[in-house]
Design a protein with these regions (language model features):
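Class I SAM-dependent methyltransferase Rossmann-like catalytic core
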Residues: 2-33
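Conserved alpha-helix/loop element of class I SAM-dependent methyltransferases that forms part
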Residues: 26-46, 61
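Conserved Class I S-adenosyl-L-methionine
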Residues: 57, 171, 186-260
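A short acidic, Gly/Pro-enriched loop at the edge of an enzyme's catalytic core
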Residues: 100-111
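A short SAM/SAH-binding and catalytic strip from SAM-dependent methyltransferases
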Residues: 110-123
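A short glycine-rich, Lys/Arg-flanked "PGG" loop and its adjoining helix->strand segment in the class I
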Residues: 125-137
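Conserved catalytic/acceptor-binding region of the Class I
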Residues: 138-202, 212-223
Length: 260
């Protein structure tokens, strides 16, 4: 949720990643399944929305629980929506939209879910305000997002090379709680969990980040290509952090629920 991330960069990055996204999105699937395990669909809820649906993994899970209720799948990147529609051509209403400016009616939804998407929104007050607008009274917002403990190893390795920001910055659970309260949400529930993923080489991690569209999108990132020498030095610094031959990356996941 870096305020410095430009929407056009997000749209372009995730649109380009759509075709190969599923092959590198194992973490996203694990987190999405845990999100629903923690905050399942209410049998009494109205229409359900998957905000930042990507290629539709969470959309499919929600569709299986919807019991004939309307399901909306929204994403800022049209190629992602097209990939989701190819999986779930019936029973879902697809909308290409910015999460901070939802083209939905007031109080028309019972629940909003979002899996590892809202961290790319620059304006938390606008995001939480518009989600609250489109939910009916008592409606639930439930989402998983990256926390500041994400990719700490990669941050530390790049810090040995230069002073630029090479890794996306994410806000804390405390900041999210404050922003939800300021927007009028109540009964907030935030749980932090750290996932670890392993790679044969640092280059494999970098390819995965690019494959899911989550490479460095900060506006204050270094402009121009990274040199081979810089990349070599970063890889050496990353490897020096590891106690054995494994390359490990940490991902802090914040599971958040609040009610209108």
């Amino acid at each position: 949720m870096s305020a410095a991330i430009a929407k056009r960069d997000i749209r372009r990055s995730f649109g380009a990643a759509a075709a190969g996204y599923d092959s590198v999105a194992a973490l996203q699937r694990r987190v999405g399944a845990e999100l629903l395990a923690r905050f399942d669909v209410s049998p009494a809820a109205g229409a359900i929305a998957d905000l930042g649906c990507g290629t539709g993994f969470l959309t499919g899970l929600l569709l299986g629980r919807a019991a004939d209720r309307p399901v909306y799948a929204l994403d800022i990147a049209l190629p992602m929506l097209q990939a989701a529609r190819a999986k779930w051509p019936a029973g879902v209403r697809y909308v290409c939209a910015d999460a901070e400016r939802l083209p939905l009616a007031d109080a028309g939804l019972g629940q909003i879910y979002s899996n590892l998407a809202l961290q790319w929104c620059a304006d938390l007050p606008a995001l939480f305000g518009d989600c609250r607008r489109v939910l009916a009274p008592g409606g639930q917002l439930a989402f998983a997002t990256f926390g500041p403990g994400t990719l700490v190893e990669l941050k530390a390795a790049w810090a040995e090379v230069d002073d630029y920001r090479h890794v996306n910055a994410f806000v804390s659970g405390a900041e999210i709680r404050d922003q939800l309260a300021a927007a009028g949400w109540h009964d907030g529930d935030i749980v932090s969990r750290t996932y670890s993923t392993e790679y044969a080489a640092v280059a494999d991690l970098m390819r995965e980040l690019k494959g899911i569209g989550a490479h460095n999108l900060n506006a204050d990132r270094k402009r121009g290509p990274t040199t081979r020498l810089q990349l070599r030095d970063m890889i050496a610094a990353y490897q020096a952090l590891m106690p054995d031959a494994r390359i490990v990356a940490s991902w802090e996941i914040l599971f958040v629920r609040a009610f209108r």
